[in-house]
Amino acid sequence: MDTDKKSDFFPRSSVAIRTRVAWRAGYLLAAFGIYMADQASKAWAVRALRFGEERVVIPGFFQFIYTENPGIAFGQLQEGGSFGRWFFVVLAVLAVIAVFYYFMRTPRNDDRVLGACALLLAGISGNLTDRARLGYVIDFIVLHAGNFHWPTFNIADASITIGALLLAYDLIFSHRSTRINADLKDVS
């Protein structure tokens, strides 16, 4: 039985199920490691920065400042109250389910997409944990250069951003290269 077929998402045998999950285990372990790093770094931020302390890492470029973000990315939609909190929790749960489904359907040789999905799973889960537990997401990493100031973020946000960029790159360029290769085969 070929477990890479997209139509075979639910394999019939337990061997096929173990095979399908086994080779993805490394990606899931990496996602779990990123999730744990995110949660540990947020716990550090609460202890070290919560009462207004700033830590400058590289003057004029990189520092840590504790913030609580009840909204979504870059502080948008912060006025949702309790409804907004649970709306974002449900949205994040649906996103985790969708990404995991896509992850399980991705062929084993598609490392970029599998890695992107692992990053997305780690990041979404990290922020979901904060939002469900606290009602907000802990952000503390600040990057700036001159007048440019990137919104405060955390490891989960970075994971989501990198995963989304990898997935977008794959969606844009892999189909293009597949089309080019198909066109070259037609010509020859």
Predicted features, each with a name:
Residues 2-188:
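Alpha-helical transmembrane bundles and membrane-interface segments of multipass inner-membrane proteins
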